[in-house]
């Protein structure tokens, strides 16, 4: 006979923290250099002029200006550019 009561164990009970992905600055909005435009997994959006690509595929502004989203090329790639606004 068992001297301890058998205790079942659940294989659930885990959850990952939210990653807060998505577009942070939308088309037509003003942005400063260094600000994040899109947080993404993989390149759903590709960097255009004035936009850098981070190690985790984050798109960020390299210059001050306005954000512009467009679809380019035969592959219909969605690109993000920052157009500098002349004062």
From Swiss-Prot:
Source taxon at top rank: Bacteria
Annotated Gene Ontology cellular component terms: cytosolic large ribosomal subunit
Family annotation (InterPro entries): Ribosomal_bL27, Ribosomal_bL27_CS
Disulfide bonding pattern of the chain: none
Keyword presence, Ribosomal protein: yes
Record's keyword annotation contains Cell inner membrane: no
Keywords: Ribonucleoprotein, Ribosomal protein
Name of one Pfam family that matches: Ribosomal_L27
GO BP: any one term: translation
Ranges that cross the membrane: none
PROSITE patterns, A to Z: RIBOSOMAL_L27 (PS00831)
Coiled coil stretches, renumbered: none
GO molecular function: structural constituent of ribosome
NCBIfam families in the record: L27
Protein family: Belongs to the bacterial ribosomal protein bL27 family.
Protein name: Large ribosomal subunit protein bL27
Organism: Stenotrophomonas maltophilia (strain R551-3)
Gene: rpmA
């Amino acid at each position: 006979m068992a001297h301890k009561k058998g205790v079942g164990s659940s294989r659930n009970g885990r959850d990952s923290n939210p990653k807060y992905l998505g577009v942070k600055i939308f088309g037509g909005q003003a942005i400063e250099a260094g600000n994040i435009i899109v947080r993404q997994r993989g390149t759903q959006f590709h960097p255009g002029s004035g936009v850098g690509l981070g190690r985790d595929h984050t798109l960020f502004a390299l210059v001050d200006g306005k954000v512009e989203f467009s679809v380019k090329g035969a592959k219909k790639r969605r690109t993000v550019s920052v157009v500098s606004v002349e004062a």
